[in-house]
Amino acid sequence: MKQLTILGSTGSIGVSSLAVIKANPDKFTVRALSAGYNVKLMLEQCLTFQPTYASMADEASATALRQQLAEYGCKTEVLAGVQAACELAALDGVDQVMAAIVGAAGLLPTLAAIHAGKQVLLANKESLVTCGRLFMDAVEQSDAQLLPIDSEHNAIFQSLPEQIQRQLGYASLSKHGVERIILTGSGGPFRETPVSALADMTPDQACAHPNWSMGRKISVDSATMMNKGLEYIEARWLFNASAEQMEVIIHPQSVIHSMVRYRDGSVLAQLGSPDMRTPIAHAMAYPERVASGAKALDFCQIGALTFLAPDYARYPCLQLAIDACNHGQSATTTLNAANEIAVAAFLQSQIRFTDIAAVNQHVIEQLTLPEPTSVDDVLFIDSWARQVAAQTLTHYVR
């Protein structure tokens, strides 16, 4: 029986993770849950899974949860703040930590799990986008194990030899015959929208992903393909891949979740329904297999799989991310922070869809900070970029 802490339990990945746990009660149990401000859903989760601990982002949310749990006679101990999330990530007796807090807020709790030597199911892209080398060094030093949850990275992981799976971030791809990692993306809801019409796209249109069910921030990132850009950066770190060993292609059906091309001409791919329960169940049970509840693929119903090269005029955020990755950790941290501010403004209808890339590019162009050598450096760059992005928004506000 594996004991888990779920960081970000009320988000999309957290909810899917709990669904997999519920489907396999003989294999997994919840020790702790951590979330932001969604007291209503956290209450339901605590009553269903009876964790020993739960934490909320602030004291007001924690107090509200405490009072409601007391009414139901639930004995879950409720904590508050980032430090509480870090403590739950490092709890003795916890085998796995699902790191699913969206954004830079997930950085410190995820690192706490790494430093505690946990098996970390990594769904928080920002840990690698903002901390890269620092993060991978911490993994090596603490003897923690990373298992990727993003459907693309999980697909790549499954398509790689076991020797690389056991040495994520350090194994040589070429030594094991790997020629190229092929990252696939659907192209989002605006793949066929005229470029001239993109400025008029609304938040609701951007969040209507054709294949996946996701949170609103990640849905917008999918529409701009910034999501794929962040995944590109993450893949470079996770799989120790050079720019020459990476390729991004658009695959509208989202059936092939990513591929690995080998030296002998073979291409291994992982296919499945667009359901996050599949990679979650794979990582939770690794190296075994358990039921995820995901619908089986019907190849006859799919009919055809298609592919095309990304159009960088349509997806400038993807190009920005690739360029930032080649530039260094300061640039990727800056881009990630600026993008969070820009997307939040778009979701509140303060700026236009096409302004997201413009804001991101402007902030990147202001960057003169050196490469980070500590987490504090990363957090400083992150804070600086958010301030510059917020100032930049004033030029674009509708």
UniProtKB/Swiss-Prot annotation:
GO terms for biological process: isopentenyl diphosphate biosynthetic process, methylerythritol 4-phosphate pathway involved in terpenoid biosynthetic process. 1-deoxy-D-xylulose 5-phosphate binds at residues 125, 151-152, 186, 209, 222, 227-228, 231. Its cofactor is Mg(2+); Mn(2+). Pfam families: DXP_redisom_C (PF08436), DXP_reductoisom (PF02670), DXPR_C (PF13288). Pathway: Isoprenoid biosynthesis; isopentenyl diphosphate biosynthesis via DXP pathway; isopentenyl diphosphate from 1-deoxy-D-xylulose 5-phosphate: step 1/6. It is an enzyme of class 1 (oxidoreductase). Gene3D superfamilies: 1.10.1740.10, NAD(P)-binding Rossmann-like Domain. Keywords: Isoprene biosynthesis, Manganese, Metal-binding, NADP, Oxidoreductase. Its EC number is 1.1.1.267. Catalyzes the NADPH-dependent rearrangement and reduction of 1-deoxy-D-xylulose-5-phosphate (DXP) to 2-C-methyl-D-erythritol 4-phosphate (MEP). This is 1-deoxy-D-xylulose 5-phosphate reductoisomerase. It comes from Pectobacterium atrosepticum (strain SCRI 1043 / ATCC BAA-672) (Erwinia carotovora subsp. atroseptica).
